[in-house]
Amino acid sequence: MSDAHARSRARLPLRTRTALAAAAGARWASQRTGRGKGSMIGGLIAARIDPSIMQRLAAGKRTAVVTGTNGKSTTTKMTTAALGTLGEVISQADGANMDAGIIATLTLGRTAPYAAIEVDELHVPHVSDAVDPEVLVLLNLSRDQLDRVGEITIIEKRLREGIARHPDMIVVANCDDVLVTSAAYDAQNVVWVAAGGGWANDSISCPRSGEPIIRDGDDWWSSGTDFRRPTPTWWFDDDSIHGPDGFTAPLRLNLPGKANRGNATQAVAAAVAMGAEPTAAVEAVGTVGEVAGRYGVRQVGDHSVRMLLAKNPAGWQEALSMIDPDAAGLVIAVNGQVPDGEDLSWLWDVRF
């Protein structure tokens, strides 16, 4: 145990120290019995012993929270890379984005001054109350796992309410997404990013007035209120990323697709808002490759196979755009298990 870790542990209340010891024991038992790394069970046990443990472990950290329907894991890894130019960063390695996974991550990264935390959309309000993030990154909002999440407009309203409780928090929001814009519109500190919004089927009406959303190229506005697309501070094109004060730099990524250029732009904007040097942040996001199995390339016989993941219509639209039209073949596998949602009716909305 490092001196810094020991000093940090000594400052914690007895209940929290007991919770950490129990979590460590659970991880050890899980690994010894071949049942996995034990991070999740450790997080669950720690939270049961000390319900305030997330808040206690996050205290003193400069934290970026990343959320959205699609791109959370990728953007979190990019944000981690960009913040890494400032110092040590703790983040989930496996995309476990609910309370137990977040607690497990914070447990293992006690001494890191920075945290980049992926958070499920439903959990953002109470997680933000616990970790008090310096930056909240809002990527996109669309239908996802209807048997668990429900109506997306409910998520938008909950996010809006959660943001209102943190007036000092910087919100890095995608102004091309109508629902994200609505969630962030009233925030006091917003950095608007034109990160792309190819899927518009879930935002044909204004979330604030119910009137139609009118679109003209990249611009959009509500016919019933003065609610419209804000002017972005950050944006990207086929070659470069552009930011405030005339900043421009080449944007070279290891990941395919326009959506990932948008993810990278939001990650850079978040890191810069927390003090990163822009050029260094851009170079850092370009180092990100495979993300929890996504985008990885596997050799199968004589073929190189790239793995893509999508779990809703918006995600599939982006994934399909990444497929090489000259590829020798395409295999689509559908998982209808609990972690990814048992309601598969959304597949009918994908233009295969």
Please provide the spans of the model-predicted regions.
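Active-site beta-alpha connecting loops in nucleotide-dependent enzymes
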Residues: 291, 303, 309-352
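Generic secondary-structure signature for well-ordered alpha-helical cores
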Residues: 27-34, 88, 160, 164-168, ...
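Short N-terminal or domain-adjacent regulatory/targeting segments
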Residues: 38-53, 287-289, 314, 320, ...
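Active-site flanking residues adjacent to catalytic metal/cofactor-binding acidic residues
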Residues: 117, 173-175, 262, 307, ...
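Buried hydrophobic packing segments
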Residues: 79, 83, 102-106, 264-274, ...
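Cofactor-binding loop segments of dinucleotide-utilizing enzymes, especially the Rossmann-like FAD-
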Residues: 68-69, 94, 195, 283, ...
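Phosphate-binding loop of NTP-binding sites
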Residues: 3-192, 199, 205
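Adenine nucleotide phosphate-binding catalytic loops in nucleotide-utilizing enzymes
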Residues: 3-12, 189-314
